[in-house]
């Protein structure tokens, strides 16, 4: 069995009397891609914020695989993490330095080339396209990556490039947790799906298991059935 990188149990977040996250459990194992899906306002993004410490939880426990995990966690919440005035290469070298690792120019160029960024090695990050910026934010070899709608607002080519990069990260040994409303994207990328509705997990499993268990033919039907949007 694969090692557990993240174990979140009983997460609760209240805004006044409303529980936007209501007892959510989430487990992430090494080398797996987990898609967190659900309608707008279901609690997906808030759950990620609680796990990352960006918002204070009202209840629950979060355990990572090691105490100094932060240097090995990559985060991309709607906007990509980078330093706009630094070149793509200098951003990569800084990411490495933050993880206490030396990165030579040659190594940096090779990494950027592998991610389709060879032509912008010396370009300021602020001048990169949206798709290039998102790729730059994911190339520093994290062990665990959190992505909130990583392909939102991108053109078809950029979406394809980000999907390929996510799959490459997983193939290289990273675990990825991402939110998405695109069921085609979820089907192509996810090893496991967690569906949230009204702040609770209502379904969890592999795509194949969920389709079989709920007797539907595709993930779009599954989504509509379990969120109640099929009756809307």
Stretch-by-stretch model annotation:
Residues 52:
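Helix-to-loop junction immediately C-terminal to a conserved catalytic motif
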Residues 56-71:
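Conserved ABC transporter NBD signature motif
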Residues 93, 97, 103-120, 139:
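Conserved ABC ATPase "signature" region
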Residues 124-128:
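Conserved ABC ATPase signature
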Residues 145-148:
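Catalytic Walker B motif of ABC-type/P-loop ATPase nucleotide-binding domains
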Residues 186-188:
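A short, surface-exposed alpha-helical micro-motif characterized by mixed small hydrophobic
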Residues 204-205:
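ABC ATPase "signature
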